[in-house]
């Protein structure tokens, strides 16, 4: 994912005598200031002000990833009521979570004095627009459908009765024993029969049709062309040769994951999710706009869904000959509102000018490391150490903190019995990492943990070792800035034509800190030629790893390494301070607002509250919360935010 999901919590900062750029000092300060407004629950659009503490902490709880890999959205419905305790108890549980300093995030680049603000008081305060490789920014600004002589007419969608559609859907999905469905043509004409044929093939992929005479009446007979394998296979359906095979469209969504939206579309269209492609997934708790491509589904069918879709819309349709690929984007453009800010105009000006001119440290954000007392990087380290008993224990053992009730029971059963089958019975949903590992242990036995672990999807397994690489990188970058500041020095690394080279003494004046990269550890990278290079080695030795041998006996877990810029300077940085009285009102118009002609509420010139509206563009794999952290000078971890907020509200 290019961006990091952040909970809707007040980012108050402790009082500080100066702008010392070190988060460790900020951490030690005592918080006494109380916020002026409450926050809304993660599931509501409206801001809740009557019960700010409960709302604030429930919102943070809704954003918790319940286990190392994060579960699929539908699993949230299984959360048990025993977790709905008072906010104080949830805050106490979150004391066991991670803070930024736990994962090496300790430095700032600017010396300005930080200030308070509330991020995502409304999910509409965080808007992401995808930027394609050619620089085009995705916007939803057109609901029209491309004109195509071979597109089905509007009558295609109304010619079938609800009863006919139900029978056809059951036939399509093999839900009954019928091998065909007969639909009588009431007003018989060739044109009417053509429309019915077209409607069935368009709305129910995998079905074929023919016309039959029965007792002097005309019937359209729908049947399966080639058994179950033909179900929803768009490659088997007729498609005009002159039209591109992929319909590209803009997906505008509110408070919904990208995959959730695609799964909803798949169900409506009766197709498999894998015929959709995209360049990246976007946050849930935000408004996001991105391009999607789908194989052999007409724009008209997609546009027709806008009548029934909740929290997302489709538009800007076009036909092309290619799908989309993950990572094929230039980045994302963010529009962020920080509400109830306390900074002076001078503080805000200094912070934003620094962001525009210098940038921020390109740390891997908190979501890279999970939110429980067992960070994902620890599991990654155990994998690299080939310590499979430790891997199993870290994933399955009980841990303090906020988790779903059934996971707690599963872990307790595992700790008590070490019986994978018994522990698995405690999980109503088996697709989480814990469930997959337990299934693997049941199948392969406790003496073959490697094979059992291999049942977990590859991307999830690799997430752990990538988390460890990120952990090392964050720590080394903090040490690099601590020891050498924000200037390029001899021995630093830069990229020339994609190849890393060291900066030499006689060449150092040709480079700035914005050119410097640092390696993620691996067998195919080089390290700085100053004491930070030695620090990498020392850190890995302390973790029982050999920096000169990052190949693993299991090929998937061999780390080739990579390079990452240590400072990112956002593009298209703009900001303004907006006064407002009502925390529930929007402070800018979204794409959908503009399409629907909704005017912005009239804002006061001198309101009770002030908000900072900021815009900036970032490259892929860069964390927007790290840019916001630099502006506010605040720890972005859920643990820190939750503890700070309960302190203010006491």
Question: What spans do the regions from the language model cover?
Answer:
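Non-catalytic, substrate/partner-engaging modules appended to enzymatic cores
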Residues: 2-650
């Amino acid at each position: 994912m290019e961006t990091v999901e952040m909970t809707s919590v007040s980012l108050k900062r402790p009082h500080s005598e100066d702008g010392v750029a070190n988060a460790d000092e900020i951490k030690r300060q005592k918080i006494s200031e109380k916020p002026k407004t409450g926050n809304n629950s993660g599931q509501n659009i409206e801001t809740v002000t009557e019960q700010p503490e409960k709302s604030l902490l429930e919102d943070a709880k809704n954003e918790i990833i319940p286990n190392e890999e994060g579960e699929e959205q539908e699993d949230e419905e299984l959360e048990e009521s025993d977790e709905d305790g008072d906010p104080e108890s949830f805050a106490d549980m979150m004391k066991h979570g991670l803070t930024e300093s736990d994962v090496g995030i300790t430095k700032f680049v600017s010396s300005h004095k930080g200030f308070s603000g509330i991020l995502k008081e409304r999910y509409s305060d965080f808007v992401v627009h995808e930027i394609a490789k050619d620089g085009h920014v995705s916007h939803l600004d057109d609901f029209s459908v491309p004109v195509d002589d071979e597109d089905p007419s509007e009558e295609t969608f109304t010619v079938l009765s609800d009863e006919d559609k139900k029978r056809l859907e059951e036939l399509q999905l093999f839900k009954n024993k019928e091998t065909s469905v007969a639909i009588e043509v009431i007003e018989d004409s060739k044109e009417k029969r053509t429309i019915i044929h077209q409607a069935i093939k368009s709305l129910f992929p995998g079905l074929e049709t023919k016309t039959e005479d029965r007792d002097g009446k005309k019937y359209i007979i729908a049947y399966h062309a080639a058994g179950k394998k033909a179900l929803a296979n768009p490659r088997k359906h007729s498609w005009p040769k002159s039209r591109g095979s992929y319909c590209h469209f803009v997906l505008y969504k509110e408070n919904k994951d990208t995959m959730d939206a695609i799964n909803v579309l798949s169900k409506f269209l009766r197709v498999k999710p894998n015929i959709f492609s995209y360049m990246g997934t976007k946050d849930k708790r935000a408004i996001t706009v991105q391009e999607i491509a789908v194989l052999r589904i007409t724009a008209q069918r997609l546009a027709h869904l806008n009548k029934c879709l909740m929290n997302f819309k489709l538009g800007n349709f076009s036909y092309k000959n290619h799908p989309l690929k993950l990572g094929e984007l230039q980045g994302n453009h963010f529009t962020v509102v920080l509400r109830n800010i306390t900074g002076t105009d001078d503080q805000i000006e200094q912070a934003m000018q620094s962001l525009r001119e210098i940038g921020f440290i390109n740390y891997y954000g908190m979501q890279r490391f999970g939110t429980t007392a067992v960070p994902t990087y620890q599991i990654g380290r155990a994998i690299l150490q080939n310590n499979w008993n430790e891997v199993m224990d870290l994933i399955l053992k009980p841990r303090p903190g906020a988790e779903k009730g059934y996971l707690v029971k599963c872990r307790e059963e595992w700790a008590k019995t070490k019986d994978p089958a018994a522990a698995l019975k405690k999980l109503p949903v088996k697709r989480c990492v814990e469930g997959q590992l337990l299934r693997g242990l049941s199948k392969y036995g406790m003496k073959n943990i490697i094979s059992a672990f291999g049942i977990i999807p590859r991307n999830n397994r690799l997430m752990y070792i990538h988390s460890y690489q990120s952990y090392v990188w964050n720590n080394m970058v903090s040490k690099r800035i601590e020891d050498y500041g924000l200037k390029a020095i001899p021995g630093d690394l830069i990229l020339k034509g994609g190849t890393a080279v060291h900066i030499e003494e006689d060449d150092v004046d040709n480079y700035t800190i914005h050119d410097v990269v640092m390696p993620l550890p691996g067998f195919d990278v080089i390290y700085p030629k100053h004491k930070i290079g030695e620090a990498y080695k020392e850190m890995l030795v302390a973790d029982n790893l050999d920096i000169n041998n990052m190949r693993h006996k299991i090929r998937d877990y061999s780390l080739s390494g990579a390079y990452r810029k240590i400072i990112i300077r956002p593009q298209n940085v703009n900001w303004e301070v907006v006064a407002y009285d009502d925390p529930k009102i929007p402070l800018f118009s979204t794409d959908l607002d503009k399409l629907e002609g909704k005017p912005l509420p009239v804002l006061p010139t001198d309101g009770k509250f002030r908000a900072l509206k900021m815009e900036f563009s970032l490259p892929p794999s860069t964390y927007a919360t790290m840019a916001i952290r630099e502006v506010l000078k605040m720890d972005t971890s859920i643990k820190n935010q939750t503890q700070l907020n309960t302190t203010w509200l006491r």
